[in-house]
Amino acid sequence: MKQNNSAAKQYFAFQWHITDECDQRCKHCYIFSENNCKRPDSMSWEQMQETFYNCLDFCRVYDRLPCFYITGGDPILHPEFWKLLGLMKEHEIPFTILGNPFHLNDEVCRRLKEYGCQKYQLSLDGLRETHDWFRKPGSFDITLEKIGCIRRAGI
């Protein structure tokens, strides 16, 4: 979706929850809350394509540029995650990933950047003791380490 007059258009942001899958069990997460007994679910590739093109159509109708915030659970765990990023790249759509840092390394971050990832949003829930209580022991230090991977990739 190459735009020649992009300076004149405003972005319309879509926050897109593509999967409930996550290998963390953060205390405050709605997906795994005690009253939520459903099995984790993910969108199929067909649903993802339909949603993607519906969002593009919406933006055409309302003269906006699409921008996606891809989230989940942890979106990188979706089996079609990289395929979706390929679709974003093919259409030159800017996107941000909202996920946890546990599956990031220099190679993954380099790939994210190559596909066009502009930002990677992760959480710090306070200082070490508070963050590790909400998430899991050691996660504060892992998060800080993974911020380095994100920075080195230029995200």
Residue ranges and their predicted role:
Residues 35-39, 128-134:
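A short acidic, helix-capping loop that chelates divalent metal ions and anchors anionic groups
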Residues 95, 154-155:
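Hydrophobic anchor at the start of a short beta-strand
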Residues 73-74, 127, 137:
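Gly/Ser/Thr-rich helix-start
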Residues 89, 151-154:
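Anion (oxyanion) recognition and catalysis
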Residues 122-124:
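Conserved phosphate-donor/acceptor-positioning beta-strand/loop module used by diverse small-molecule
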Residues 135-152:
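Glycine-rich S-adenosyl-L-methionine
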Residues 1-119:
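Conserved alpha-helical substructure of the radical SAM core
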